[in-house]
């Protein structure tokens, strides 16, 4: 009475992954055990210092030019000829005033250049031009 009808000469083409899993688990255990030892093993008591908190950063003035060419300072619409005096007053209050200039991409470059010139004439040297990524 024969139970098997297959040829006994066939080659087994499957890979035995059990030894691979065993090795990987051993490596995992080794890394888990040694990982805490990799931290600084020299105990050092660092000295405490008395430091002053850094000064608060003031919000910058935001000069905006919309698609229609209207000029805004911190969301308040102003006339272009008043920009320089408005910024000079802000410079008088805070010598370290920062200005962020943002303009719609459809705005004429000449308007942006005029706004930059007004910012420069007001004595403001910290200017950032805001763009989208």
Swiss-Prot record:
Periplasmic compartment segments: 38-133
Primary localization: membrane
Membrane topology: Single-pass type II membrane protein
A Pfam family: ExbD
GO biological process: protein transport
UniProt-recorded Gene Ontology molecular function terms: transmembrane transporter activity
GO cellular component, one term: plasma membrane
The keyword Protein transport is annotated on this UniProt entry: yes
Origin: domain of life: Bacteria
Entry keyword set: Cell inner membrane, Cell membrane, Membrane, Protein transport, Transmembrane, Transmembrane helix, Transport
The protein's assembly and partners: The accessory proteins ExbB and ExbD seem to form a complex with TonB.
Similarity-based family: Belongs to the ExbD/TolR family.
Role according to the record: Involved in the TonB-dependent energy-dependent transport of various receptor-bound substrates.
Protein name per its UniProtKB record: Biopolymer transport protein ExbD
Organism: Pseudomonas aeruginosa (strain ATCC 15692 / DSM 22644 / CIP 104116 / JCM 14847 / LMG 12228 / 1C / PRS 101 / PAO1)
